């Protein structure tokens, strides 16, 4: 006997369109010295959050990643967190 393939399709969740914060606010710049801004894009473990999580556009997500890496190099941000 073959199994029947009559599964119900999962209900579709409404997709919320997120706008890039930096595209919306043209005057806000991404700088490696602005650690308060950069900490919002870093997880508790010290990883850079993904674009689908932050809602940034491609260019600004790249700029955030470069700024975080530069801030880590000059010891403004830690490479990893101390929580284990």
Curated annotation (Swiss-Prot):
GO MF annotations, alphabetized: small ribosomal subunit rRNA binding; structural constituent of ribosome
A Pfam family that the UniProt record links to this protein: Ribosomal_S18
Chain ranges passing through the membrane: none
The keyword Ribosomal protein belongs to this UniProt entry's keyword annotation: yes
Protein's GO biological process: translation
Keyword Nucleus part of the UniProt annotation: no
Keywords: Ribonucleoprotein, Ribosomal protein, RNA-binding, rRNA-binding
InterPro entries xrefs: Ribosomal_bS18, Ribosomal_bS18_CS, Ribosomal_bS18_sf
Function: Binds as a heterodimer with protein bS6 to the central domain of the 16S rRNA, where it helps stabilize the platform of the 30S subunit.
Family: Belongs to the bacterial ribosomal protein bS18 family.
Official protein name in the record: Small ribosomal subunit protein bS18A
Species in which this protein is naturally found: Mycolicibacterium paratuberculosis (strain ATCC BAA-968 / K-10)
């Amino acid at each position: 006997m073959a199994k029947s393939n009559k599964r119900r399709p999962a209900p579709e969740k409404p997709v919320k369109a997120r706008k890039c914060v930096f595209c919306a606010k043209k005057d806000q710049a991404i700088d490696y010295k602005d650690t308060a801004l950069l900490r919002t894009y870093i997880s508790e473990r010290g990883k850079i959050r993904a674009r689908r999580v932050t809602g940034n556009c491609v260019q600004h997500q790249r700029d955030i990643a470069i700024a975080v890496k530069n801030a880590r190099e000059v010891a403004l941000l830690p490479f990893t967190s101390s929580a284990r």
